[in-house]
Amino acid sequence: MRVDALTSTLEQRVLLNDLDLNLHMNNGRFLTVCDLSRVDLFIRTGLLALMLKQKWAPIIVRHTMDYKKPLRPFQKYTVSMSITRWDEKYFYATHQFLSRGKVVAEGESTAVLLGREGVVPPAKVIEAVTARQNGTAVERR
């Protein structure tokens, strides 16, 4: 799989429904935006279609965020998410929020894909996505 395919970058703006009582972006909204970046990656790599076909469900098992600066109403920001590595069970990703050239938040997440038989090994997922990108049929398992 191409390395650039493992990164999602989205440009966003803080909306009024993103705010907390302190009038900056709510910490929970940062996590929701991380979810949006994952969905973007799933769509662009073809993984979403495979997940639907194979009945695989993405599960975040751990997510940490460090908040460095607040994001104010209507402020523009960019969120980048990269899958940095995987092992026999988990995918590991980093998330970075930038505004005006400065890091405002960053975090890491650990995820699995669950199938009918339990956790789908990342190697199997990568193989299936690569085959799909190359136009090769992948059998349903």
Residue ranges, per PLM feature:
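Hot-dog-fold acyl-thioester-processing enzymes
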Residues: 1-60, 114-141
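HotDog/MaoC-like acyl-thioester-processing domains
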Residues: 71-78, 82-141
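Hydrophobic beta-strand-centered segment that forms part of the acyl-chain substrate-binding groove
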Residues: 41-85, 106, 112
